[in-house]
Amino acid sequence: MPDMQYENAARAAGHTWVCGIDEAGRGPLAGPVSVAAVILRADFSLPGLDDSKKISAKKREELYHQLIEHPAVWWAQVEIDAATIDSLNILRATHQGMAAAAMNLQQKYQITIDHCLIDGLPVKQFPLPHQGIVKGDGKSLSIAAASIIAKVSRDQRMAEYAKEFPQYGFERHSGYGTKQHLHALHLHGPCRIHRRSFQPVAQLSLPLDSH
């Protein structure tokens, strides 16, 4: 289970504002990458908080609402859309989202973040001091909190897109390459939220605005 060891170590080293950052949605064929940045106060406590991939959708939803309403949680969330992903590539788009989430968090609460904990490897040219923590969402509570906010926010966005593009079933697979999604892609072609740099979407050469 994640805990506050990384956050506490950063504070012991003299850092005041320690921020956890994580993303959701790097792999899907459609929709945005969602990135959240979270600061947890030292006295933060929320039983059951874990890596978003290890808990049920219902539990994630419960934890999401508890987190965003928690007095000891400061957070910000951003989305990088499919067009930007296609323009930059998925890795650079994700890194852009991480930087934007941290900057939004600073602006939202009028603070200066002095240390970030990022899920995964360190990010080149990141605008703030940081460390990468491989599988950090299972080790750091602030990264775990960010993973839940990023994931649930993205699922909510994909449910909205499902109403706009009902033929794809986004509410069921959130844009991932399931059998149902692939069948719909071949039947209807891609829509404007599909990532045209991703296979097999790239193979379907229909005009961008045809659906």
Model-derived segments and spans:
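RNase H-like, Mg2+-dependent phosphodiesterase core
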Residues: M1-H211
